[in-house]
Amino acid sequence: MGNEKARVGIIGASGYGGIQLVRLLLEHPQVELTYLAGHSSAGKPYSDLYPHLTHRVNLTIEPIDLEAIASRCDAVFLGLPNGLACDMAPALLAKGCKVLDLSADYRFRNLNTYTEWYKKDRQDQATNNQAVYGLPELYRDAIRDAQLIGCPGCYPTASLLALSPLLKQGFIVPETAIIDAKSGTSGGGREAKVNMLLAEAEGSLGAYGVAKHRHTPEIEQIASDLAGTELRVQFTPHLIPMVRGILATVYATLRDPGLVRDDLITIYSAFYRASPFVKILPHGVYPQTKWAWGTNLCYIGIEVDPRTGRVIVLSAIDNLVKGQAGQAVQCLNLMMGWEESLGLPQLAFYP
């Protein structure tokens, strides 16, 4: 595209993921934000939804008009509830737009798995076959050549970055993998929910979606690819009383009980040597969610328990940035041939 900025639109910009996209794209040196679209909020100035942006964003949320969007955008982010993107992506792709879907619609190669977990029948297998899973640390080259990206969920991002070196190189017994993950309340979105009320969430910690969370098959699909065999993982998410961040703690049995922590730190550092957003911590240092706030970083700490023969990997991300909007922009950078880290923050809000 030469020195011209890419024209980018967002369909579904009213939620927390949407405003993260708006923030990142407004500050991106190669992007012009040209279209914000939505259903219930159509006709409203974007600053009506987020008044602190009154002096920065002068766009009005427009109706979802695929013809207009395609004529005004080179790339489109779909920040819609599950089950809607698959009705829009084929038309946008046919009109030449690059599409990055933040919902679950294009994360699964097997649409029967999607239907089983998300309860929507699909008739777009041909379009689905074009989709690339948007985890750059694993699929960087495929993302560069893609027109359609299925952006990963927040829990799968944190979990898979923790697990990938172990599975890819066969260091663990795959079926022993257990993922214990904790997320802030922004992961539940902006709509009012009783369990997200301050009076309900403050001072409380609880699990949800036990043995049935929708991110489970997403994790299993990629983990199976890495391991070279179909596998199941035990995944349990928890809600904690903070706004943003995910900490995933992964446990697995080592094939070689002689592996020590320093060996694994070296292995992880080599695995992610070309990944600018993954930071492997030195021995004895374990990540905290606040370190990643507002950034596209993933911090990983590693430990081995010689008594049990298990490895323990801790992964911390910002669920709204590396777990959602930031990772989507990272994919856009690759699709457009730009520097992968362009326009993405690497310094946290601290404290």
Curated annotation (Swiss-Prot):
Gene3D superfamilies of this UniProt entry?
Dihydrodipicolinate Reductase, domain 2 (3.30.360.10), NAD(P)-binding Rossmann-like Domain (3.40.50.720)
- Reaction equation(s) it catalyzes: N-acetyl-L-glutamate 5-semialdehyde + phosphate + NADP(+) = N-acetyl-L-glutamyl 5-phosphate + NADPH + H(+)
What are the recorded GO MF terms, alphabetically? Answer: N-acetyl-gamma-glutamyl-phosphate reductase activity; NAD binding; NADP+ binding
Q: Where in the cell is it found?
A: Cytoplasm
Which residues are responsible for catalysis? 154
Q: Pfam families attached here?
A: Semialdhyde_dh, Semialdhyde_dhC_1
Which terms are listed as keywords in the entry? Answer: Amino-acid biosynthesis, Arginine biosynthesis, Cytoplasm, NADP, Oxidoreductase
Q: Which family does it belong to?
A: Belongs to the NAGSA dehydrogenase family. Type 1 subfamily.
> What's the name of the protein?
N-acetyl-gamma-glutamyl-phosphate reductase
**Which organism does this sequence originate in?**
Synechocystis sp. (strain ATCC 27184 / PCC 6803 / Kazusa)
**Designated gene of the protein:** argC
